[in-house]
């Protein structure tokens, strides 16, 4: 794990809207760890303007609810999350996840339920792509990089964390996300993904709910660069 200076990654609090800082500050004040994670951090490092920001914390959904009260709504069964409102803005706040002791999966290996809370070290390996696994603590001015994600961003490489076949079986929607991110960000796809990213692998998508499939397909075809 590398602890990088945010300034060296081109990051500063001046780039952040007040609503995400409000969420990070409230969780920190309550005694919890809190980071900005995912596409927001990735896009800032690429010099892009993120459309939203997500947070992650060691607080459980019920504890997040205690911090924010009526501003918070717990959603999800497969992946339990907290939706926190800051003014008119919505921030998705997730709890650090650990590998399931006994995964609830479909016959094809897709994870059907994943609410095993863990540490930040356990959480990063549960994420899909390395470029989405950067943990930014804006008040401390640091970025935690567990998987050389900064190098992947620098070299514009899309790389899955873990074995690609297993990660696609866990969540087949990642196949569509691979295509979308590669096109949207103009990244090359790592060879180990291309090796198993075949038309035959599309059968995994049969287990995905119509809602999730529609949502990700819509993102794929409505993004200008993806099209």
Can you annotate each of these PLM segments?
Residues 1-226:
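Catalytic cores of the polymerase beta-like nucleotidyltransferase superfamily
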